[in-house]
């Protein structure tokens, strides 16, 4: 099982690193001779995606091929894949199976002690230690320069199991450290280098430090091909941003993987905070004001700190498996690892490989003019408090629309003209005022028409991935069930080595298949994004709009039919029972029907069972026929609109688009009561932690216990809030545009946003007291202040951290009253006004006079 780990284009060669069948690493240079295609009249066995004949045109070098593309671009003459790394992988690695345990991954972290955080673009201060975990060796290598004392293994606070795997290399000087580390790096050159925030700091700093101390030749020796690319740009905030590319080594910043693939927003992305929320484990704490003092005064804990930093990233991946996810996507698409982080390249390669197998030729990448197109439909909610809410959502809406309408570049027939806005046109289709005479053509709501006699490339590919995901989900479930059965057997009969091994293997296989299904899910969800990206090979603005327009039609169409049915059953006229709709979902007010049938008087499972039956009836009698009728009305290729019941909620409220809360009794058949809160401050990472907790409880009381209980809670919560630690009531933001909003002395200027003021005040105090400053773009926590000797009304500090000891006196000036009003009462008032609740007891004339 030979598999590539890196392929780089350098000059006329493709420079490849690969692992052979026995697990040994190799390098080779290949003088690749690419093939492109041009149209012809004769039959050759090759056709473009439109069915026209093509013949191959071979080139001796990649340079010649690139030159030919450039020279003929204006004539639209040349066809084929112009990314020769993708074509080479496709030629050589037809079966891309891999074994993660054979791919060498380095997890690194560097320390550069200084009073202020040094810029990676200049690397001005020495590197005093480097931590490096090698997954093949399963060891932590730590290179360090002692300061006040030596690092002693027996004095370490690191866990014993980590110490057993730690190899400490003592160095006398920075040059010795860098020379020894370079020797080690070249002996065990990783295929992948990862770590936390290494793209912005560690890797550019290491590269620039080697350049500063030893020159470019030594710097380039970090690359197995002797070539390191360094680029520096200036961002919108005037900061120099340095990016490096060590050719032959893929850089996968774990911070970037976490942001891209976990689909959660955090108030802070500091490793310390992420480690705590994901692993319940933090960095090693230190008392010093900055890293320089930490290094100089406590070298023992300084090295322990480094080991723990590397270990946190290692443990995060053991839990999240984002490295496996990324590598799986890379090999599935047939691209380099780091290319997975791009928006369009994975699908570009997937479609190319699929068409190549059928001797179909992709069009050449063209420059497209971007444009705006209709977005998703969001129905304005019926603001207020509601009972008996059922929601239904469409399965994989945008991918399903692509399949239903057969949307693809080569299936386009044309676009029907229409008067007025697209929104008006969709409404007319819903009203039955527009007809589509040609049965042989599939239609979307924006007038686009597609062939039905051939299946489009895009629908075919998304269907393949869809079914692969389904198969992997099934396998993951089977192995998970197997693990449950083995665990039950061990509980009943006792554990044996054989059963334990079988259990671990089942869990391992379940995780692998789960990662594979997640990889497919990511691909499915990303295709529509690629389709609407002007840099995508198969981009067409009309197709992108055809998808969203049909999505709007699908929701409006079914809402019409649900309303017709409920009005008939409940004997009402023109009542809108669809409380809200958003992209692929509708939220329906079933309370009048539940009242008619007496279901609203039931409790517990009796209520939920009967309510579920009502929704099942609506699915069967209304929704399914509705989408079958839509498919026939629009003459689409095949029906792919399938809507399932999602939540059953006894109560709920809506206050604006994308802002609502539901007391869910059942979610897709799973009886696990919980609150579903969307868009309200409880869900915002900027909301203080204690306010998130307080608002969530207030919402629970509103939905489950009523106004009196809410008033009782708010009265007691105010006392809890004002007695809480300041970190619990701090609100989170980002320190952006600090240079823009400050003068040459670092003072806030005119129009400076409040949170930026707080960061600038903090940095002024940092200069005075010698602790680390807040950097541009950092996540910060902010608190309001009462009168103080500095005359400032707020202070920021690094999110997830605390105020430095030197300015801890400001804790006594935290303005709890203002924070309480602004961060708790203000959002609670917005909810209360919308649902006509009073969050505090008011005295009326009637109550006053008894």
Curated annotation (Swiss-Prot):
Region entry Beta hairpin, spans: 228-245
The UniProt record lists the keyword Phosphoprotein: no
Site (Optimization of metal coordination by the polymerase active site): 582, 658
Reactions performed catalytically: DNA(n) + a 2'-deoxyribonucleoside 5'-triphosphate = DNA(n+1) + diphosphate
Binding-site residues for Mg(2+) 3, renumbered to this chain: 393, 584
Annotated positions for site Essential for viral replication: 666
Functional note: Replicates the viral genomic DNA. This polymerase possesses two enzymatic activities: DNA synthesis (polymerase) and an exonucleolytic activity that degrades single-stranded DNA in the 3'- to 5'-direction for proofreading purpose.
Family listed: Belongs to the DNA polymerase type-B family.
Protein name per its UniProtKB record: DNA-directed DNA polymerase
Organism the protein comes from: Vibrio phage KVP40 (isolate Vibrio parahaemolyticus/Japan/Matsuzaki/1991)
């Amino acid at each position: 099982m030979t598999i590539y780990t890196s392929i780089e284009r350098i000059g006329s060669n493709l420079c490849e690193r690969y692992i052979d069948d026995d697990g040994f690493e190799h390098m080779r240079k290949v003088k690749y001779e690419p093939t492109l295609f041009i149209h012809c009249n004769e039959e050759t066995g090759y056709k473009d995606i439109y069915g026209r004949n093509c013949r191959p045109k071979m080139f001796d070098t990649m340079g010649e091929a690139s030159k030919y593309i450039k020279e003929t671009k204006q004539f639209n003459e040349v066809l084929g894949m112009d990314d020769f790394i993708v074509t080479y992988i496709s030629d050589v690695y037809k079966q891309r199976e891999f074994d993660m345990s054979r791919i060498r991954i380095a997890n690194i972290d560097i320390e550069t002690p200084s009073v202020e955080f040094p810029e990676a673009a200049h690397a001005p201060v020495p590197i005093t230690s480097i931590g490096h975990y090698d997954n093949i060796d399963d060891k932590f290598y730590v290179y360090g320069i002692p300061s006040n004392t030596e690092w002693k293994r027996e004095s370490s606070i690191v866990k014993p199991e980590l110490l057993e795997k730690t190899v400490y290399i003592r160095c006398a000087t920075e040059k010795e450290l860098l020379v020894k580390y370079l020797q080690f790096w070249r002996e065990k050159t990783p295929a992948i280098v990862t770590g936390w925030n290494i793209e912005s700091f560690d890797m550019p700093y290491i590269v620039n430090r080697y350049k500063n101390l030893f020159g470019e030749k030594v710097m380039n020796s970090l690359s197995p091909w002797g070539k390191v690319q360094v680029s520096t740009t200036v961002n919108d905030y005037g900061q120099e941003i340095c990016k490096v590319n060590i050719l032959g080594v893929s850089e996968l910043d774990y911070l970037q993987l976490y942001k891209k693939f976990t689909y959660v927003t955090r108030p802070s992305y500091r490793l310390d905070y992420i480690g705590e929320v994901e692993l319940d484990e933090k960095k090693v704490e230190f008392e010093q004001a900055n890293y320089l003092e930490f290094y100089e005064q406590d070298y023992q804990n300084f090295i322990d700190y480094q080991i723990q930093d590397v270990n946190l990233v290692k443990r995060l991946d053991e839990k999240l498996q984002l490295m496996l996810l990324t590598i799986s996507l890379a090999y599935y698409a047939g691209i380099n690892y780091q290319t997975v982080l791009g928006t369009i390249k994975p699908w570009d390669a997937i479609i190319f490989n699929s068409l190549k197998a059928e001797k179909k030729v992709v069009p050449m990448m063209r420059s497209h003019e971007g444009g705006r197109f209709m977005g998703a439909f969001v129905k304005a909610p019926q603001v207020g408090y509601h009972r008996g809410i059922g929601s239904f959502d469409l399965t994989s809406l945008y991918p399903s629309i692509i399949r239903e309408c057969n949307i693809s570049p080569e299936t386009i027939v044309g676009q029907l003209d229409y008067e007025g806005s697209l929104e008006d046109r969709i409404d007319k289709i819903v009203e039955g005022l527009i007809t589509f005479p040609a049965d042989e053509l599939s239609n979307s709501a924006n007038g686009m028409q597609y062939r039905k006699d051939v299946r489009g490339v895009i629908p075919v590919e998304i269907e393949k991935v869809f079914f692969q995901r389904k198969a992997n989900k099934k396998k993951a479930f089977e192995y998970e069930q197997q693990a449950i059965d083995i665990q039950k057997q061990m509980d009943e009969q006792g554990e044996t080595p054989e059963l334990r091994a079988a259990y671990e293997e089942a869990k391992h296989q379940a995780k692998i298949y789960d990662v594979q299904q997640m990889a497919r899910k990511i691909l499915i969800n990303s295709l529509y994004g690629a389709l609407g990206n002007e840099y995508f090979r198969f981009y067409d603005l009309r197709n992108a709009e055809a998808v969203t327009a049909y999505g709007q039609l699908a929701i409006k169409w079914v809402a019409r039919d649900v309303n017709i049915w409920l009005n008939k059953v409940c004997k009402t006229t023109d009542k809108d029972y669809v409380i809200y709709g958003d992209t692929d979902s509708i939220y329906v007010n079933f309370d009048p029907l539940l009242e008619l049938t007496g279901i609203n008087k039931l409790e517990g499972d009796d209520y939920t069972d009967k309510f579920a039956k009502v929704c099942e009836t609506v699915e069967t009698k209304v929704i399914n026929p509705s989408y079958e009728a839509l498919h026939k009305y629009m003459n689409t290729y095949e029906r792919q609109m399938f809507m399932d019941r999602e939540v059953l909620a006894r109560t709920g409220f809506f206050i604006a688009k994308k802002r609502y809360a539901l007391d869910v009794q059942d979610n897709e058949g799973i009886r696990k009561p919980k609150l579903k809160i969307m868009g309200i401050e409880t869900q915002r990472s900027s909301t203080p932690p204690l306010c998130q907790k307080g608002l969530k409880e207030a919402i629970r009381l509103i939905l489950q216990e009523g106004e009196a209980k809410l008033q009782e809670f708010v009265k007691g919560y105010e006392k809890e809030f004002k007695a809480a630690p300041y970190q619990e009531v701090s609100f989170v933001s980002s320190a952006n545009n600090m240079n823009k909003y400050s003068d040459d002395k670092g003072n806030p200027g005119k129009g400076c946003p409040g949170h930026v003021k707080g960061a600038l005040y903090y940095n002024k105090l940092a200069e005075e007291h010698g602790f680390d400053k807040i950097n541009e773009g950092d996540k910060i926590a902010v608190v309001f202040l009462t009168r103080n000797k500095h005359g400032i009304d707020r202070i920021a500090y690094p999110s997830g951290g605390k105020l430095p000891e030197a300015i801890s006196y400001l804790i006594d000036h935290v303005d709890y009253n203002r924070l309480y009003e602004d961060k708790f009462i203000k959002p609670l008032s917005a909810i209360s006004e919308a649902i006509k609740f009073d969050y505090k007891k008011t005295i009326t004339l009637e109550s006053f006079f008894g």
